């Protein structure tokens, strides 16, 4: 496991070594994929120019028509997870006064157990510095 740190928007997260990385052209994030399972982790961040709060962003999330919907909310973060066909999508967004950062994970329903393990292990390391 190593830690991805974004210098443009101060956030970081631990990533398994087997995941291959693609930096985004803008430098605001990175995309990682496990070549064996197709598990994808997209990390991206941007400046909180509108002084939004996590709660304001959470209530604006469009959850209509999403199957197996799961949501959670904390003081400065929220999670939305759902299924699209045979893909599970899990998004955690952290909001601070200066930065909004999102970890977007996608994995096959066939890899549900592995996905849950990765979420339980890695998402606690996702933070805005």
Which ranges hold each PLM region?
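Second-shell loop/turn segments in exported
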Residues: 3-5, 41-48, 105-113
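Signature of long, low-cysteine stretches enriched in small and polar/charged residues
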Residues: 57-114
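Surface-exposed amphipathic alpha-helical segments
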Residues: 19, 100-129
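Secretory pathway targeting signatures of secreted, lumenal, and periplasmic proteins
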Residues: 7-55, 83-86
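Intrinsically disordered, low-complexity Ser/Thr/Pro-rich tracts
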Residues: 1-5, 124-127
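Short secondary-structure junctions
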Residues: 18-25, 60-73, 127-129
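Extracytoplasmic/secreted proteins, especially bacterial periplasmic and envelope-associated proteins
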Residues: 14, 56, 117-121
């Amino acid at each position: 496991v190593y830690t991805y740190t974004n210098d443009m928007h101060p956030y970081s997260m631990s990533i398994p070594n087997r995941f291959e990385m693609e930096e985004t052209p803008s430098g605001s994030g990175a995309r990682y994929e496990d070549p064996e399972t197709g598990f994808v982790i997209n990390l991206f961040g941007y400046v909180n120019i509108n002084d939004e709060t996590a709660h304001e962003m959470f209530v604006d999330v469009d959850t209509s028509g999403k199957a197996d919907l799961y949501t959670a909310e904390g003081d400065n973060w929220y999670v939305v997870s759902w299924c699209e066909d045979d893909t599970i999508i899990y998004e955690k967004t952290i909001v601070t006064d200066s930065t909004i950062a999102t970890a977007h994970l996608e994995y096959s329903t066939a890899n549900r157990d592995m996905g849950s393990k990765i979420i339980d292990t890695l998402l606690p390391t996702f933070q805005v510095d």
